[in-house]
Amino acid sequence: MPFKPLVTAGIEGLLNTFLYRSPALKSARTRLQGKVLCVKLKGFSMPLVLVFSERQVDVLGAWEGEADCTVITQASVLPKLRDRQQLATLIRSGELEVQGDIQVVQNFVALADLAEFDPAELLAPYTGDIAAESIGKVVRGGAKFLRHGFQRQQRYAAEAITEEWRMAPGPLEVAWFAEETAAVERAVDSLTTRLEKLEAK
């Protein structure tokens, strides 16, 4: 299947660009040299195997040997791994399952935390620094605008459904209904106990 090599090559290119370009990250990279990290994403049949060497990281779709560390998680958790402060929290909450040498994933998260993921760096060799930075700002601004627009439309839809069209109850109506239901339940319980007492006499 040609899709698998395309995905692994794309991820490999991104990781090598951000993690192996800067000489300042050399000490963090040496801790991972010779290590194999396997990332299994729930919902995906193909694991990603990261093989670290002195000059690059190789991303493979399969690995015959045994990985030093295997990480099992959801794809939505991967962006959180850029912050090394969250690693312990993710493991405790069960969002991230680590098998094998935990030091490997700790070193990888530390390296990712030190690396600066800036899309302008990818564009700079082709467009120049100023144009790349300008394009990056426009893209970030556009993404922020779209995110806020989506959240606003979500709010509008929720208000229309609950307030205008009355297709669903509002939050206060739900709370009132829950209180009334609890009151009826308490009344039925007290009536049941009174009836049981009367029947016992």
Curated annotation (Swiss-Prot):
Pathway: Cofactor biosynthesis; ubiquinone biosynthesis
SUPFAM superfamilies cross-referenced by the UniProt entry: SCP-like
Listed GO CC annotations: cytoplasm
Presence of keyword Cytoplasm: yes
Keywords of this entry: Cytoplasm, Ubiquinone biosynthesis
Main location per the UniProt record: cytoplasm
Recorded phenotype for the gene knockout or disruption: During aerobic growth, mutant is impaired for ubiquinone biosynthesis and for growth in rich medium, but it does not present any defect under anaerobic conditions. Mutant is also impaired for Salmonella intracellular proliferation in macrophages.
InterPro entries linked: SCP2_sterol-bd_dom, SCP2_sterol-bd_dom_sf, UbiJ
Boundaries of every SCP2 domain copy: 15-112
Localization (cell): Cytoplasm
Gene Ontology annotations of biological process type: ubiquinone biosynthetic process
Record family assignment: Belongs to the UbiJ family.
Function: Required for ubiquinone (coenzyme Q) biosynthesis under aerobic conditions. Binds hydrophobic ubiquinone biosynthetic intermediates via its SCP2 domain and is essential for the stability of the Ubi complex. May constitute a docking platform where Ubi enzymes assemble and access their SCP2-bound polyprenyl substrates. Required for intracellular proliferation in macrophages.
Name of this chain's protein: Ubiquinone biosynthesis accessory factor UbiJ
